[in-house]
Amino acid sequence: QPVAREQALALLDRVGLLAHAHKYPGQLSGGQQQRVAIARALALKPDIMLFDEPTSALDPELVGEVLKVIQSLAREGMTMLIVTHEMDFALSISDRVVLMENGVVQADIAPQVICSPLEAPSLQRIREFMGVR
């Protein structure tokens, strides 16, 4: 049990919540609860993490704290599959971007290709959808 507690505290520290280790879920904000969920998933030492709209239910002021944790995981080399509408964020941390429409893959490309209008003119519709000019 001391090892599990030590690991739990280390993971809470990793997601910026060590100071809240004594709190119950109802005492945490939505963003804090989401970060606890990330810490719990990390406890299993996964090879890949799936995030399905990790910020969709959060108040706008809490979105940044969750994205910061995910960005940190990306920098550490964690493989992640992220379903998101946070387009700028996805482009900034991704090695690959897969865009789907009506369940069909429209593109599976490097974010640099999306951000460069001179490359692949056929992606113009996708760029417009993502707000990339």
Set out the residue ranges of the language-model regions:
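Conserved beta-strand-loop-alpha-helix hinge in the C-terminal portion
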Residues: V104-R127
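A short, surface-exposed alpha-helical micro-motif characterized by mixed small hydrophobic
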Residues: A90-S92
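Helix N-cap at the start of a conserved alpha-helix in ABC-type nucleotide-binding domains
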Residues: P60-L62
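Catalytic Walker B motif of ABC-type/P-loop ATPase nucleotide-binding domains
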Residues: M49-D52
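Helical segment within the ABC ATPase nucleotide-binding domain
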Residues: G64-E76
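H-loop/switch region of ABC-family ATPase nucleotide-binding domains
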Residues: T84-H85
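Conserved signature/switch motifs of ABC ATPase nucleotide-binding domains
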Residues: K23-G26, L44
